């Protein structure tokens, strides 16, 4: 039997992810009889707290990666998209906004608190990450009060989106990381451009309706906008009907970003795709 692996993107999270793929091809390829031995060769592990009296092991840093690369070259090949497709280069732009008033005061208060928590070695990694997410939410126009209720702080990103769309011709993809923002964007677009102007792909949309949304975005002239969460709609879809992609908000996942960019920048795209980060 012949075994092969085909992947659309390189390993983006950790070199350690290679072990199971190579073991599937042939357990002898990398020269290790166990994952533990492989991990010890290519990663220095450390422990972080994740709760009361609970710790998990994570890589502190990777090592001997040139050796691993040489081993991979013996049985793998890589062809980049620009080597097999005639696509125009991606164009990138950024639109900056400044926090003002109440939002700025809340951000500064959260920032000071977050710095204290991040520097405290006794506090778990998940709690530290929560503080960073709170800052990110304020930048995206909302926060949660002490009762867990969502509070709107500003419209600056929506205003920036309005300006961009006023300058843009053709269809547009708008990616947003938070459900709050997705609903806000959809409401704005349907109010200004009409109920049929916008389709969406995110967690609340069922699989059948997601497929319909893609088909309408690609083929229906009445549909101008696709609003989605890149973690939900950013993989495997063809959305080449547009040449403008707006990132209203981002996550911290690089793989999600790359994959969502390539929904428009793929086979069938004739124009130059512009990516705008707010």
Predicted features by range, described:
Residues 79, 136, 157, 210, ...:
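Short, cationic motifs built from Arg/Lys/His that form the positively charged side of catalytic pockets
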Residues 1, 5-6, 31-170:
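Inter-lobe coupling linker of SF2 helicases/translocases
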Residues 1-36, 84-111, 224, 228-278:
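SF2 helicase/translocase ATPase core recognition
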Residues 154, 177-180:
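Helix N-cap/beta->alpha junction signal
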Residues 1, 70, 74, 96, ...:
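Helicase-associated low-complexity regulatory tails and linkers flanking the ATPase motor
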Residues 149-151, 202-205, 250-252:
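Short, contiguous acidic/charged loop-to-helix segments that flank catalytic cores in large enzymes
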Residues 173-175, 183-186, 192-233:
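Conserved helicase ATPase core of P-loop NTP-dependent helicases/translocases
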Residues 7, 139, 176, 202, ...:
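Short beta-strand/turn micro-motifs composed of small residues
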């Amino acid at each position: 039997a012949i075994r092969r692996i085909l992947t659309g993107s390189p390993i983006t999270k950790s070199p350690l992810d290679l072990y199971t793929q190579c073991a599937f091809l042939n357990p002898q390829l990398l020269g290790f009889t166990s994952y533990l031995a492989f991990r010890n060769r290519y990663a220095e592990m450390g422990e972080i707290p994740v709760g009361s009296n609970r710790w998990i092991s994570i890589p502190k840093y990777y090592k001997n990666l040139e050796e691993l690369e040489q081993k991979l070259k013996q049985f793998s090949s890589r062809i980049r998209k620009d080597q097999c497709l005639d696509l125009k280069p991606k164009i990138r732009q950024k639109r900056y906004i400044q926090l003002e008033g109440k939002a700025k005061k809340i951000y500064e208060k959260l920032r000071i608190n977050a710095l204290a928590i991040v520097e405290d070695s006794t506090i778990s990694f998940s709690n530290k990450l929560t503080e960073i997410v709170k800052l990110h939410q304020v930048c995206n126009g909302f926060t949660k009060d002490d009762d867990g209720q969502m509070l709107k702080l500003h419209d600056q990103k929506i205003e920036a989106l309005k300006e961009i769309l006023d300058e843009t011709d053709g269809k547009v993809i708008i990616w947003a990381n938070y459900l709050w923002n997705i609903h806000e964007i959809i409401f704005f677009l349907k109010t200004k451009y009409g109920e049929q102007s916008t389709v969406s792909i995110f967690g609340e949309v069922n699989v059948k309706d997601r497929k319909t949304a893609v088909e309408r975005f690609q083929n229906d002239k009445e549909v101008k906008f696709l609003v989605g969460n890149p973690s939900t709609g950013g993989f495997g879809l063809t959305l080449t009907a547009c040449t403008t992609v707006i990132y209203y908000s981002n996550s911290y996942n690089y793989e999600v970003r790359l994959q969502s960019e390539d929904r428009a920048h793929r086979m069938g795209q004739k124009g130059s795709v512009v990516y705008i980060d707010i």
